Amino acid sequence: MKIDIVSVFPEYFEVLNLSLLGKAQSKGLVEVTAHNLRDWTHDVHHSVDDTPVGGGAGMVMKPEVWSECLDELLQLEPAVIENTENIEDSADSFDTGDSCDTTDSDTAQSSAGPENSEKTDIAPSSAGPVLIFPNPSAPLFTQQDATELSHADHLLFGCGRYEGYDARIPQYYRTQGIDVREYSIGDYVLNGGEVAVSVMLEAITRLLPGFMGNAASIVEESYTGDNALLEHRQYTKPAEWRGIKVPDVLLSGNHAKVDRFRRDEALAKTDELRPDLIEALDCTKLDKADRKTLMALGWEVSAAHPRKR
């Protein structure tokens, strides 16, 4: 997988050379390149921002600089649009993404733009690049999005700053046939998109074949799979520590009982902390023991999806 990152602080991404992601790059599984947006400026101050049209606080990242950069990295022919009346206003519809991780404003963060709100089960085409902007006012980045994007051959991340990037940037590249995503990583705002990009990048790349030392370690994680739940608690040795014991069943050696205990704990934990995930479960995929546990937790499981009594 090829990954390009555009930022005014490319040094931030030196951390990607550490740990498993660093090893994945050494093995050739991932190629990560961080670019300085200012390299595409032409003025003495290397300016990448300007005042907001219509007034307001802060500065907005300029489309001219971004377009020169993205045209080159996406290998597109530079174009100048003299009349944009035929381009539909993308502010009316988002594609994917939602929280707030970007810059000081709602656009710099980490979510998908207006055209990202419609989630899809279809993985991005492996042939074409996917352009991703963090944006706190976009749809929320989820494990499902990470799974879909892990099938892409080329990801290009753009990190916003200040009050964010000009809204016409993602709008224009969608009209050029580029798969553009805007995502948020949570309901909060950061100083820039770098942190959000790092979060998404790690969530995506760890799903690549050969990335994890033990592929089975990601199978039962929180939010993973069709009927996603929060993961059960984990323990290691010693069996008793400072008066707190590991649950006896985990020491029994009975794998079936261990599996059932962990499954029941995952259901109970999800019921307490994320009941919305229980509501999304497909009851036809629940076994008899799952149904019994959910009913004991106060859920009705006779319909297509569980419903709290």
Place the predicted regions along the sequence by residue.
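Structured adenosyl-cofactor binding patch, chiefly the S-adenosyl-L-methionine
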Residues: 165, 169-219, 223-224
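S-adenosyl-L-methionine/SAH cofactor-binding core of RNA-modifying enzymes
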Residues: 62-94, 104, 116-161, 209
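A short acidic, amphipathic alpha-helical/loop segment
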Residues: 20, 144-145, 169
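Short, conserved loop/helix-junction motifs that constitute active-site signature segments
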Residues: 2, 149-151, 177
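N-terminal nucleotide/polyanion-binding subdomain common to many enzyme families
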Residues: 1-76, 256-271, 276-277
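Hydrophobic/aromatic beta-strand patches that form the interior of the parallel beta-sheet core
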Residues: 4-6, 33-35, 132, 155-157, ...
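SAM-dependent methyltransferases
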Residues: 84, 89, 98, 229, ...
